[in-house]
């Protein structure tokens, strides 16, 4: 196999541009709220800038680490991440917000282990699929063990009230298994078996039912369950084609909840308009398309599965976030990669891009 020197510069550029633009949008979306809550309009800007710096350093390190090293660390990282997920439940260590226990409290920083768990899952599956790909046509020795492991992780995430992360991990794993050659009937059969459980989880939790009803008809409860999506629509509608101008949005002025986190695209749409949203969506599409090309041209199965999993993760999270913001899906609590405020998501996303970039230096041909 011929080795191609040099990183995929388009992947690198998209990650850097999206992150830098995200820092700007975090400031625009949060400055007024930060000034009122923390008496410092630059509070979230300074923190997000620090997260971006750490993320860029992590990406730079990952770019220069031979991705084959992750084979040795795939299982320890996977098990270690599971331990971190359990630490969330330990009093004094785990942090709770809005009824969800998802964070580990660190000095000056709350770490969300589910973000690391997504990448750890991809690394473990890439390692395992390379070794066991010939067994995937069999149910008990091939497909079922992955579902068993996934079931344990998903149970822990659901106990943390983090259905968004649980569904994301499940979707990424299923796509990776399908790409590796798992029979479609196994996947469809698992879906039919899991359907009653999913319905039970939704219909037995009042807050999840409110999300579903708000998704179907937000105007039925415009001041509570439907409030967030209605304010998001108002922001996007007000932005029109060209937007109100950077920093000129009104919905971020205590109307739109989570304006600098999960719904930052709404602020972007109001200030940069339809054009701005299309540009951001196009950048994500280009990032995912180039990442998949890196996966296809990878020199071995481990690199192929690793790059493909990262591409699917970033693309899926971006798609789901945009779908939620525009009302095409119920709210899930999934951040927009590179743009939403949050250290765990940004740092892990940039580091995963660094791993993917290292894969791009060892390909069978130019991507």
From Swiss-Prot:
Pfam families: FTSW_RODA_SPOVE (PF01098)
Reaction catalysed by this enzyme: [GlcNAc-(1->4)-Mur2Ac(oyl-L-Ala-gamma-D-Glu-L-Lys-D-Ala-D-Ala)](n)-di-trans,octa-cis-undecaprenyl diphosphate + beta-D-GlcNAc-(1->4)-Mur2Ac(oyl-L-Ala-gamma-D-Glu-L-Lys-D-Ala-D-Ala)-di-trans,octa-cis-undecaprenyl diphosphate = [GlcNAc-(1->4)-Mur2Ac(oyl-L-Ala-gamma-D-Glu-L-Lys-D-Ala-D-Ala)](n+1)-di-trans,octa-cis-undecaprenyl diphosphate + di-trans,octa-cis-undecaprenyl diphosphate + H(+)
Topology class, membrane: Multi-pass membrane protein
Listed GO CC annotations: cell division site; plasma membrane
EC primary class: transferase
Entry keyword annotation includes Cell inner membrane: yes
PROSITE patterns (UniProt xref): FTSW_RODA_SPOVE
Sample GO molecular function, one term: lipid-linked peptidoglycan transporter activity
Residues that span the membrane, as ranges: 9-29, 50-70, 73-93, 139-159, 162-182, 184-204, 226-246, 267-287, 305-325, 336-356
One GO-annotated biological process of the protein: cell wall organization
Pathway(s) it belongs to: Cell wall biogenesis; peptidoglycan biosynthesis
Keywords: Cell cycle, Cell division, Cell inner membrane, Cell membrane, Cell shape, Cell wall biogenesis/degradation, Glycosyltransferase, Membrane, Peptidoglycan synthesis, Transferase, Transmembrane, Transmembrane helix
Periplasmic side: 30-49, 94-138, 183, 247-266, 326-335
EC number: 2.4.99.28
Topological domain spans for side Cytoplasmic: 1-8, 71-72, 160-161, 205-225, 288-304, 357-367
Cell compartment(s), UniProt: Cell inner membrane
UniProt similarity note: Belongs to the SEDS family. FtsW subfamily.
HAMAP family for this protein: PGT_FtsW_proteobact (MF_00913)
Function: Peptidoglycan polymerase that is essential for cell division.
Protein name from the UniProt record: Probable peptidoglycan glycosyltransferase FtsW
Species of provenance: Geobacter sp. (strain M18)
């Amino acid at each position: 196999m011929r080795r191609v020197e040099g990183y995929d510069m388009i992947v690198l550029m998209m990650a850097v541009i999206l992150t830098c633009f995200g820092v700007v949008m975090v400031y625009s979306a949060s400055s007024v709220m930060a000034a009122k809550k923390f008496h410092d309009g630059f509070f979230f800007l300074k923190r997000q800038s620090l997260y971006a710096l750490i993320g860029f350093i992590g990406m730079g390190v990952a770019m220069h680490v031979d991705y084959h090293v992750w084979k040795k660390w795939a299982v320890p990282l996977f098990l270690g991440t599971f331990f971190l997920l359990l630490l969330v439940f330990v009093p004094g260590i785990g942090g709770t917000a809005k009824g969800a226990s998802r964070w580990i409290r660190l000095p000056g920083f709350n770490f969300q282990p589910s973000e690391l768990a997504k990448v750890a899952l991809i690394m473990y599956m890439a390692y395992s699929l390379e070794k066991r790909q010939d067994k995937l046509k069999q149910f008990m020795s091939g497909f079922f063990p992955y579902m068993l492991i996934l079931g344990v992780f998903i149970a822990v995430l659901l106990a943390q009230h983090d259905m968004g992360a649980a569904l994301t991990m499940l979707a990424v794993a299923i796509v990776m298994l399908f790409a590796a050659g798992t029979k479609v009937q196994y996947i469809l059969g698992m879906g039919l078996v899991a359907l009653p459980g999913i319905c039970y989880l939704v219909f037995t939790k009042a807050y999840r039912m409110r999300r579903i009803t708000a998704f179907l008809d937000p105007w039925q409860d415009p001041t509570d369950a439907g409030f967030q999506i209605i304010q998001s629509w108002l922001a996007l509608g007000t932005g029109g084609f060209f937007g109100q101008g950077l920093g000129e949005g009104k919905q971020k002025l205590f109307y739109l909840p989570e304006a600098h986190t999960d719904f930052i695209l709404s602020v972007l749409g109001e200030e940069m308009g339809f054009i701005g949203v299309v540009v951001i969506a196009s950048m994500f599409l280009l990032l995912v398309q180039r990442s998949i090309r890196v996966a296809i041209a990878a020199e071995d199965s481990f690199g192929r599965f690793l790059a493909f999993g990262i591409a699917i993760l970033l693309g899926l999270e971006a798609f789901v976030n945009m779908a939620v913001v525009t009302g095409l899906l119920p709210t899930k609590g999934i951040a927009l990669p590179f743009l939403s405020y949050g250290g765990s998501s940004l740092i892990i996303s940039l580091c995963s891009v660094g791993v993917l970039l290292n894969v791009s230096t060892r390909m069978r041909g130019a991507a």
